[in-house]
């Protein structure tokens, strides 16, 4: 019997022992031998030491990652890593950042988390929210402690010492909580995943865990983090963040801040709320910015590249100041460095950074469907269309504005935001073409808004009214996204009335006016309704800038240049048919017969 009791109650391991074992599992699953050697070398060169403990401080991490002071993001990052380093014993946060803790941090902060977290990005989103959040305890529970999964009773002395001495900005309580009231049922799975790696068999006892309420990410902290993530979006692991320092001064900094504000507006109304709730956080990130935290990859994988292991560097080499290759080879009125980084939050950066080129600009080539067609239709790779302008007044002013309003159904929706400056865009994967009978595009088409609120409207897989390009004398010449094709069979409708899709963007054929329609209560459109603004709204605006950018490399650019050259030669050949013979009088007579010159311009009528 004594033997049986011994088997039923194995010796329990301390937090520290389990943490070291989990760190070892993370290391073996997520790092190569060379990467871990580099991490140890970097840690050794940076760590401070107190007694026998070697650890990383906030200013050390900020300095090594080269986080610009002007962003104010260093305390936010240190709050995150001090929390994530406690995984899976999150009730112990904030913790001293020893090497095992840094292993946890780097795995969770980079794409390497996919091999160790059961639900991948969903688990990581939960952890990142908690690492950013401020937790308020109910007064009656302020002294309660959260039992860990194994009901361990051995204290972790070093972690308690850190809690007493911690001055991490952003923590509202000494001990960060392990519960988010919106998602309690998923907590067991997240923690158990880690304990399964450790072969800890005891069940998670959440019955006595204190409940947290009003867990929120402070708005200002998230604003600072957004600016850092936008700056780091194109960062390669072996690149230095300081290469992008020109983008945090002067007008570039103001542009970065403005872009961050547009994204922040999707998460919270900064004027009326002080924080972001988890339920909203987890529901909109997969839709409007699934790549939001990808900037952490290049930032934190920096720890895995030791300068002492740079075999391309010679001993007596003089350091050379590097300059980041520009993300854009052309300048645009809408698309700039910050806007491109914003778009990379929901489209792959590998298709955008240093791979887009300006195909069409209305202010350069003219606002007409003909010039649009000439510049865009020969591009055989994905494109980005961007349009910006100023909201029209509710009462039309001037003849053209009145005519545009008359072509639309009576406006019955309010505006979608307070700002009058609007920017929308569409990602089109298929090559452009005329839509004589049906729309073109596929389920990878994305409709989005960049300003003043960042919003994304993914394509439906059922309704395929993605893109319409119809020129006169079509029933309704226009460029639209998400609208039914204007078939002649619809002539029984009012001849001058456009049919707007539930979620759609429509530009008139002169590219002078546009309308974005969001009928949230309606279903079945080509694009899904907003996950941010769950109400009906409509934006009518005067177009000020219209751009189309080609996404692709040099091969696509060469192919388009060849097609352009061929079409130009063909057009020139058509112009020279029976001309250029040297007989000016004969050429003139031929043109007069065609009705192209001369006073009569009869065109050679036989009547």
Curated annotation (Swiss-Prot):
Function: May be involved in a process influencing telomere capping.
Disulphide connectivity of cysteines: none
Keyword set, alphabetical order: Cytoplasm
Protein name, entry field: Restriction of telomere capping protein 5
Entry GO terms, CC: cytoplasm; nucleus
Places the protein is found: Cytoplasm
Main location: cytoplasm
Matches recorded under Pfam families: TLD (PF07534)
TLDc domain residues: 333-552
GO BP annotation list: response to oxidative stress
